[in-house]
Amino acid sequence: FKNRSVRNLGFGWDKTENVLWRIYHGELDGFKANMIFLLIGTNNLQFNTDKEILQGILQVTEAIKIRQPQAKLCVMGILPRANTEKRIQQINKELRKKLEQNCIYINLSNLLTDKNGIINSSLFSDGLHPNTKGYEKIAEVLKTYLDN
């Protein structure tokens, strides 16, 4: 994202509750963002129900909108991961429905899976994290939102 002022506020192992805590404690204070991209939820999969994950993501989006009301909020669906593709597809389907009125929903699953919805292992380093090629594909999509 050359020639752009970008802040990466993501942390490894974060769950929705960690992001909420940081937002409530000033993470989004002191600057005005034009656009915010949110990708959260995958680390909640082993600890929370689908409903709890959905509620957590929605709480994060509301907290962002309160603190950065001028920003265009783009929420990416949970990225597919090995052996949980169907569950993630269902959560993302519900997430898209809930967000389509207030946010831009970005579906990256089709980019990273085959026609059957199974992850394309050539785009992942470990079945969870995209590799360089996977991140390049994601970046191409995100650039289209930045350019519009």
List PLM regions with ranges:
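Conserved SGNH/GDSL esterase-like catalytic core that processes O-acyl groups on lipids
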Residues: F1-E62, I66-Q68, P80-K93
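Residue-level signal for well-ordered alpha-helical segments
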Residues: W13, N34, K72, L112-K115, ...
